[in-house]
Regions:
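Conserved beta-strand -> loop -> alpha-helix junction used to position metal-binding or nucleic-acid-contacting
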Residues: 104-117
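Conserved non-catalytic scaffold segment of RNase H-like nuclease domains
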Residues: 1-107, 122-143
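Short Asp/Glu-rich motifs
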Residues: 69, 151-152
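Acidic two-metal-ion nuclease catalytic site recognized across multiple nuclease folds
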Residues: 153-176
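Buried hydrophobic packing segments
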Residues: 93, 116, 152-156
Length: 176
């Protein structure tokens, strides 16, 4: 299956406060495109979020805002999108889109690797870093948006060999 793995980090608990995004495009089992950027959320940073991902207000001062980033990431979101804990990432995307309402936002299918993991392995040990360790992919910086997306892509490729991942598809519908 061709897909794009995506991960967002947020500045605070508001889903629209995206401050980083990482994407990895996989076609025929090979990475064909990548995108990684900090995003200026134009809002405050909660210290708890900074403690998780390490991104500070100073880091994003000269970063593009989400409307500029949207133009870059939109081509990645054409068919199957994969994320670990996809409800979080899809809610970030939905909230960010709701703020500026781009005319080119469209529907796409998405799949959650956390949901697949819970089905395959039960309820314990399903965090991204735990799965990475389980599959020997443990040399990554957890909560770095790009590295999380890259590891998610590798985990999804493993899951494709173990189950019918298409059974986990859901539909992303823009908020307007």
């Amino acid at each position: 299956m061709n897909f794009t793995a995506i991960d967002f980090e947020t500045a605070n608990c508001a889903r629209a406060s995206v401050c980083a995004v990482g994407l990895v495009r996989v076609e025929n089992g090979k990475t064909v495109a990548e995108y990684n950027t900090l995003i200026n959320p134009e809002t405050y940073f909660d210290w708890r979020c900074v403690n998780v991902h390490g991104i500070t207000p100073e880091d994003v001062e000269s970063a593009p805002t989400f409307p500029k980033v949207w133009k870059e990431i939109k081509p990645f979101l054409s068919d199957n999108v994969v994320a670990h804990n996809a409800p979080f990432d899809m809610s970030c995307l939905r909230a960010a889109l709701a703020e500026f309402r781009p005319p080119d936002a469209s529907e796409f299918d998405y799949i959650c690797t956390l949901a697949i993991s819970r089905r395959l392995f039960g309820m314990g040990g399903n965090r991204l870093n735990e799965l990475a360790e389980k599959f020997g992919l443990n040399s990554f910086r957890h909560h770095d948006a790009f590295e999380d997306a890259a590891v998610c892509a590798e985990i999804f490729k493993i899951f494709e060999t173990r189950t019918d991942v298409s059974a986990f598809k859901k539909r992303f519908i823009p908020p307007f």
